[in-house]
């Protein structure tokens, strides 16, 4: 798991490649109220139906600091909760998590000016920590490390992001322990048309072809857009997104395995409602 602030370094391209591609039939509804909200999700997959409900409560007026808590239960029997409090001191945020599998963690995020630091501790005595630094508007760097109770490093990553122009974003991630290098880029060609891609090279298996994703997005108008992507396994995802308002969003997806076109076609749809 990458701590949130470290993962934010590569978020522009990651979101472009991963978000708004519907491969299942999903209804995500948020009911807002005076003291918080309730999020209900129903996801219909080939393996069955998974439903979850998540009440969220706002404790800001009781604690005097921006804070909230939520509890999630799903039909697979998973129960988990989270409590967040911000600005314990200026720039410091704390997040506590727990679930029915007896996994507990506490995360501290500190973000101020050009520096972001995260420390993530688990009840199994493992840890995850990261440091990100904005050198200037063009360059950012970050390092992330994961270890266990025996003071053994399990993972070390480093990231460099480059924004040479407002319309170009590039990130380079070196996964030292896994011996992998990930290169990603996002290019905004016009106000309507954008392109993105990522490629992962496995240095442990130089004979293996790199894995990749290539995607594009076209804004039809202020409310709708088209997205498409293809990966190294020749899987194609095409998506139509329509925002009827700030409270309603529809995503229609067509997913094709070009290696087996007759049997590799699936469709999906996602509906996001805020009431």
Curated annotation (Swiss-Prot):
- Known Pfam families for this protein? Porin_3 (PF01459)
- What are the Blocked amino end (Met) sites (modified residues) in this protein? 1
Q: Quote the PROSITE patterns the UniProt record gives.
A: EUKARYOTIC_PORIN (PS00558)
Coiled-coil region(s): none
What domain of life is recorded for the organism?
Eukaryota
Q: List the Gene Ontology MF annotations in alphabetical order.
A: porin activity; voltage-gated monoatomic anion channel activity; voltage-gated monoatomic ion channel activity
Keyword annotations of the record? Ion transport, Membrane, Mitochondrion, Mitochondrion outer membrane, Porin, Transmembrane, Transmembrane beta strand, Transport
| Any one GO cellular component localisation term in the record | pore complex
Tell me which Gene Ontology terms the entry assigns under biological process. regulation of monoatomic ion transmembrane transport
Tell whether Mitochondrion is among the UniProt keywords.
Answer: yes
Places the protein is found: Mitochondrion outer membrane
UniProt free text on domains? Consists mainly of membrane-spanning sided beta-sheets.
Q: Which family does it belong to?
A: Belongs to the eukaryotic mitochondrial porin family. Highly divergent.
Q: What does this protein do?
A: Forms a channel of about 1,7 nM through the cell membrane that allows diffusion of small hydrophilic molecules. The channel adopts an open conformation at low or zero membrane potential and a closed conformation at potentials above 20 mv. The open state has a weak anion selectivity whereas the closed state is cation-selective.
Output this protein's name: Mitochondrial outer membrane protein porin
Q: Which organism is it from?
A: Dictyostelium discoideum (Social amoeba)
* Gene encoding the protein: porA
């Amino acid at each position: 798991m990458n701590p949130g602030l470290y993962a934010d370094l590569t978020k522009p391209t990651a979101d472009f490649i991963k978000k708004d591609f519907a491969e299942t039939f999903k209804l995500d509804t948020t009911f807002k109220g005076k003291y918080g909200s309730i999020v209900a999700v129903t996801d219909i997959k080939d393996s069955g139906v998974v439903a979850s409900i998540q009440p969220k409560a706002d404790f800001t007026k009781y604690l005097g600091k921006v804070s909230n808590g939520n509890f999630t239960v799903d039909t697979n029997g998973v129960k988990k909760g989270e409590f967040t409090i911000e600005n314990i001191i200026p720039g410091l945020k704390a997040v506590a998590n727990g679930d029915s599998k007896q996994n507990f963690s506490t995360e501290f995020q500190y973000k101020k000016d050009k520096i972001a630091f995260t420390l993530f501790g688990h009840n199994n005595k493992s840890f995850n920590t990261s440091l990100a630094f904005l050198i200037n508007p063009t360059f950012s760097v970050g390092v992330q490390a994961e270890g266990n109770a025996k003071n053994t490093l399990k993972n070390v990553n480093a990231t460099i992001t480059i924004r040479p122009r407002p319309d170009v974003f590039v990130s380079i991630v070196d996964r030292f322990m896994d011996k992998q290098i990930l290169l990603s880029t996002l290019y905004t060609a016009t106000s309507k048309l954008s392109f993105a891609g990522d490629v992962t090279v496995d240095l442990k298996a130089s004979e293996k072809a790199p894995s990749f994703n290539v995607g594009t997005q076209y804004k039809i108008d202020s409310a709708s857009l088209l997205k498409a992507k293809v990966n190294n396994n020749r899987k194609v995802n095409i998506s139509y997104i329509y925002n009827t308002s700030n409270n309603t969003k529809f995503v229609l997806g067509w997913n094709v395995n070009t290696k087996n076109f007759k049997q590799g076609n699936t469709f999906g749809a996602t509906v996001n409602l805020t009431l």
